[in-house]
Amino acid sequence: MNAGRTVSRCTAACTLDSDYILARQTLLRLRADVYNARSIDATGLNTMPYDWVPITRRKPLVWPGGKRLALIVTMNCEFWDLVKDSDKPYYAGGPPMLPDPMPGNVADFPNFTWREYGQRVGVWRLFDVFEEAGVPLSVTMNAKTALERREIIDHVKSRGWELVAHNYEQGELLPAHAFDEAAERKLITETLRVYEQVVGKKAKGWLSSSLRSTLHTPDILAAAGLTFICDYMNDDQPYLVQTASGPIVNVPYSIEINDFTFFHRRAMTSKDALEMLCGQFDELYRESKTTGKMMNIGLHPHISGHPHRMQFFRDFLAHAKRHDEVWWTTREEVAAWYLQNHRSHIA
């Protein structure tokens, strides 16, 4: 970043690279042409690549077949390196079981093996529960999961479930390259290459590790031919994200309805979590009588894959399946449908 070029925005002064500003302004003009953006500051650096449209100003969303609530169960199949080439504390893209993170170049066996439980045992237990219920999973995978834990991915493929690209390694977060677009593009490109090699087709969507992306991420994904991103958790409906290569769809993920939040951030019991899941489902289903809504449930095998949590999932799935107007779907299906129908929702 060139400290010699200063751009004033409002009353604050920011030191920014002029080439970067020009690129952002060009991109914002492209977005404005397509999406009529109205709230862009001098640099665009404080503006997200979509319009702020409150749900009260949208037309009713009608899902395929007249369904009311789109329900997506997301299973995150992630991989963590045992050590990193760094003496900085290793953030693994989620809270540890034991606190006080160790340096990245020192093996942290308790936390590593706790996470590995999900790969060795927990994921298979969860697969059984969802297969018995006849419920499809949307499975996100790190590229290293595909390379190092191929049997998990082969099982998902054999069931015809969705696979979503989910970064290269879970602890390598995209914001590490926030000021180096070429490095971020290289990481994403390599992730997508492994996806295509293992899955046998090109990826359609992306979820960033720890949901942490950069200003460049949507543009890089769209230029690579992807149709959706899942990083923005600001809605109960999909919407368009504008890029220089055309729009892609945000299919929202959720931290609120997420096993990490239930069991590790809030120390909830399975009974508490079931009450919260059913409460979320019931209210969204009630609201969806007038406009379609979507609900995402985020799961991690090392969190949810323990024996004492299985009945919790069976009970929730049974509750949801008693409602006929639920669309049990995937992110790719939602994105493909929304790209064709968004004009009847947000004009």
Locate each region found by the language model.
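Composition-driven detection of intrinsically disordered, low-complexity segments
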Residues: T6-V7, L30
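Short, positively charged and aromatic/hydrophobic N-terminal segments
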Residues: I21-R24, L30, Y35-A42
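Catalytic alpha-helical scaffold of carbohydrate-active enzymes acting on polysaccharides/glycoconjugates
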Residues: I40-V249, L274-I297, I303-A347
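A conserved mid-domain beta-alpha-beta active-site/ligand-binding segment of alpha/beta enzyme cores
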Residues: P252-F281
